[in-house]
């Protein structure tokens, strides 16, 4: 099959024809698939197991770089490879022709029959245009140790219950005997009860927190009493200071009263002086009028004497 020439130009002459494409020296790796003997070694290693290997491989085409160009390469369909290593582990995967040599090389190793190697995983050189779907059917591995969080969460309620049991299992026989004692509870014998030999009060023995609270209350009451006495002392001091204040205030009131009286007297005197001055003014004005009339009279008399 000869390589195709360039298409004819539309609307132009087809002569001279275009030169053919130059052949390639080597075909690309993704275009050529070379058969090797790895498949035989896989089959030979698995002959003892019944139906251990089931594979469907497409027909391999020997591609000559001088006969076919990369423009004429058609992508071959993928192959399905199912390898049964033992009765419990089965690998099912889909791979391309480029990943077959690595898978064959991995399966042909002698340690693949061991249980430690049966849990491995394939590593393939995946091109960008190829997608794989892996489906591994592994038996569930039992957990040797449960998670720490679950154990702690499960143990916490048990610890709480143990704490409650330890609290509820305390010995209260002495308290019960003390409460139900008739000699202590009867009012007739209450006055004849002698103080206990030990310094520890039964209430202190059974309810130490209550006694502690009572001590706190008694100390608080004593502090209140001391503050009251201090308040009384301060009140006496304040009474002395208030008497001094009242004495000074009385003095100030008397002084202000005297100053008010003096001011009122001055106001009265000024009023009287004003009235007096006003009267004097009126008198002086009347005198001025009389004097003016007299001057007029004297002038007329003088004029009469002069005319004669």
From Swiss-Prot:
Listed Polar residues bias regions: 217-229
Origin: domain of life: Eukaryota
Composition-biased stretches (Basic and acidic residues): 266-277
Domain named bZIP: residues: 242-305
Principal cellular location given in the protein's record: nucleus
Chain residue ranges for the region called Leucine-zipper: 277-291
Annotated Gene3D superfamilies: 1.20.5.170
Induction of the gene: Induced by P.aeruginosa infection. Induced by translational inhibitors such as cycloheximide and exogenous or P.aeruginosa-derived ToxA.
UniProt-listed SUPFAM superfamilies: Leucine zipper domain (SSF57959)
Segments for region (Disordered): 217-277
Subcellular location: Nucleus
Keywords: DNA-binding, Immunity, Innate immunity, Nucleus, Transcription, Transcription regulation
GO molecular function, one term: RNA polymerase II cis-regulatory region sequence-specific DNA binding
Gene Ontology cellular-component terms listed: nucleus
UniProt keyword annotation of Iron present: no
Annotated spans, Basic motif: 246-276
Effect of a null allele: RNAi-mediated knockdown increases the proportion of aged worms with fragmented mitochondria from 5% to 59% and causes a 30% decrease in cellular ATP levels at day 8 in adult. RNAi-mediated knockdown decreases survival upon infection with P.aeruginosa. RNAi-mediated knockdown reduces induction of expression of infection response gene, irg-1, in response to P.aeruginosa.
PANTHER family in the record: CCAAT/ENHANCER BINDING PROTEIN, PROTEIN MABIKI
Protein purpose: Transcription factor that binds to the promoter and the enhancer regions of target genes. May act together with the bZIP transcription factor, cebp-2. Involved in responding to mitochondrial damage. Plays a role in the delay of age-associated mitochondrial fragmentation and muscle decline. Has a protective role in response to infection by the Gram-negative bacterium P.aeruginosa. Required to prevent P.aeruginosa ToxA-mediated lethality.
Family per record: Belongs to the bZIP family. C/EBP subfamily.
Protein's name in the database: Transcription factor zip-2
Encoding gene per record: zip-2
């Amino acid at each position: 099959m000869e390589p195709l020439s360039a298409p004819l130009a539309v609307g132009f002459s087809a002569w001279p024809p275009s030169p053919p494409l130059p052949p390639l020296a080597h075909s690309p790796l993704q275009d050529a698939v070379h058969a090797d003997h790895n498949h035989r070694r896989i089959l030979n290693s698995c002959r003892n197991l019944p139906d251990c290997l089931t594979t469907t491989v497409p027909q391999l085409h020997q591609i000559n770089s001088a006969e076919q160009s990369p423009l004429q390469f058609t992508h071959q369909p993928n192959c399905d490879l199912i390898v049964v290593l033992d009765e419990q582990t089965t690998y099912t995967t889909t791979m391309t022709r480029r990943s077959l040599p690595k898978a064959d090389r991995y399966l042909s190793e002698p340690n693949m029959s061991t249980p430690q190697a049966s849990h491995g995983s394939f590593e393939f050189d995946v091109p960008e245009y190829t997608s794989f779907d892996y489906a591994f059917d592994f038996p569930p591995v039992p957990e040797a140790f449960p998670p720490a969080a679950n154990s702690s969460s499960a143990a916490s309620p048990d610890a709480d219950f143990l704490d409650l049991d330890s609290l509820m299992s305390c010995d209260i026989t002495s308290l019960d005997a003390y409460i139900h004692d008739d000699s202590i509870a009867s009012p007739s014998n209450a006055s004849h009860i002698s103080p206990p030999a030990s310094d520890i009060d039964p209430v202190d023995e059974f309810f130490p927190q209550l006694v502690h609270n009572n001590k706190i209350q008694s100390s608080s009451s004593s502090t209140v009493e001391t503050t009251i006495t201090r308040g009384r002392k301060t009140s006496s001091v304040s009474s002395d200071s208030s008497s001094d204040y009242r004495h000074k205030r009385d003095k100030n009131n008397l002084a202000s009263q005297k100053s008010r009286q003096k001011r009122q007297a001055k106001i009265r005197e000024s009023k009287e002086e004003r009235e007096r001055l006003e009267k004097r003014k009126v008198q002086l004005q009347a005198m001025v009028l009389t004097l003016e009339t007299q001057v007029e009279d004297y002038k007329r008399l003088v004029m009469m004497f002069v005319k004669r």
